[in-house]
C-alpha cells in the first residue's frame, strides 16, 4: 500500500547510496576505481608536498597530516586505510571526487541509478524541490548525477532536476539531528519541518531527521544492510519510490 503523509510534502531530501543507487556501486565500483588510479597520481607528485602547487591532487593531499605527506608510499598507505575503514574524511572525499571526475569524463564510470529513482526525481522536480544529502563531497554528487546510466546505456545528466546538494562539510554528519536542522534553516523550512521528506537506507540517519522534525522513511533496497525487527517496528519502510503517494 502506498505511503501518504498528513501534511503536503513540498521538499524531498535524498540520500544516494542504498537509496537512489545500489549500495554496492560505491563499495565495488567507486572505491576500487579510486584505489586503482591513486598510486599513479601520488607517484607523480613531488615530495614534500606544497599547498601552493598547480596540481589539484597535490593541493588536496597537502591538507593531510604532515607525517603522511613525506612520500607517496606513506600517503598511499594512509589514504587506503581511510577508504578501507570507511572514514568520512573531508580531504579524502575531495581527493576521491577529483579522481572520480576523471573516470566519469573519460567514460569509465557511469552511475547505476534505479529506474524508479530516475522517474521519481524527473517527475517530482516539476512540482517539488529535490535536494541531495550525502557523505560524499558535493563535487562527487554532481558528478554522479551528471553521469547517470540511461536506458540506452549512454550517460544522462540529472542535475537539472535537483535544487541543491549537501555534504558533511556544509551540513554536518548524517547521523546527527543538528545536520538536518541546518538543512531546514538553509532551505527556509525551519518552521515547516514536516513538509520536508528525507529518504535514506540508514536507520540512524532517518532517526536523526525525524528528531529534527522532518518526515523520514527507510529505503530497503536489495543489498542494503538487513533491518532488525525493532527497526521494522520503529520506522516506516519502502522498497521503491513507487511506494510513495505524494
Swiss-Prot record:
It is found in: Cytoplasm; Nucleus. Keywords: Amino-acid biosynthesis, Cytoplasm, Hydrolase, Magnesium, Metal-binding, Methionine biosynthesis, Nucleus. Its cofactor is Mg(2+). InterPro entries: Enolase-ppase_E1, ENOPH1_eukaryotes, HAD-like_sf, HAD_sf. Substrate binds at residues 134-135, 174. Monomer. Belongs to the HAD-like hydrolase superfamily. MasA/MtnC family. NCBIfam families: enolase-ppase (TIGR01691). This is Enolase-phosphatase E1. It comes from Debaryomyces hansenii (strain ATCC 36239 / CBS 767 / BCRC 21394 / JCM 1990 / NBRC 0083 / IGC 2968).
